[in-house]
């Protein structure tokens, strides 16, 4: 047991020495700072897109079925492109977590940001996407879009209002999770700034 603790301490000392050497000349610190800014930007874009949907909720609840379905179809070109920022944010957070020394507050806040963003993305695939399949079933879309919307297709039944409520609630949940991710990575960035 003591031997394990000693080896663990040696590993931590070696790990910190590796990071210290990386930051010694300043170029590592500047690279890490630039990567942190890119990561913050990707997470902020993800949060902004989710928040945009959530903020439309009061107005969209007043729409009749035909108008609501028409409005749904206008989102997909822009928000599909914006989805790449979401994937980029998850990848960037994972890389940032790998590069962040453990243990430490910055590590835990970065981990929290990653967990929240992965949960936000999972909400899309498990809740939002199946309802998107329903909204898009009668809409003419490109072949790549048709392939995308056919993924995880489930038979949706019920009143359109029930599906609308699920879709809208999923976007409120996504906005909340993305906001928590953005707050977490921002806090992690303040620990990075304070380590100079």
Regions found by a protein language model. Name each.
Residues 31-44, 95-121:
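Interfacial segments of alpha-helical transmembrane regions
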Residues 189-196:
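Juxtamembrane boundary at the C-terminal end of a transmembrane helix
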Residues 114-135:
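Hydrophobic alpha-helical transmembrane segments of integral membrane proteins
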Residues 85-95, 175-182:
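Core segments of transmembrane alpha-helices
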Residues 43-90, 132-164:
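Interfacial loop at the N-terminal end of multi-pass membrane proteins
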Residues 3-4, 8-12, 29:
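Basic polycationic patches enriched in arginine
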Residues 27-34, 71-81, 102-109, 156, ...:
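Membrane-interfacial loop-to-transmembrane-helix junctions in polytopic alpha-helical membrane proteins
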Residues 7, 17-20:
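Short hydrophobic alpha-helical segments enriched in small aliphatic residues
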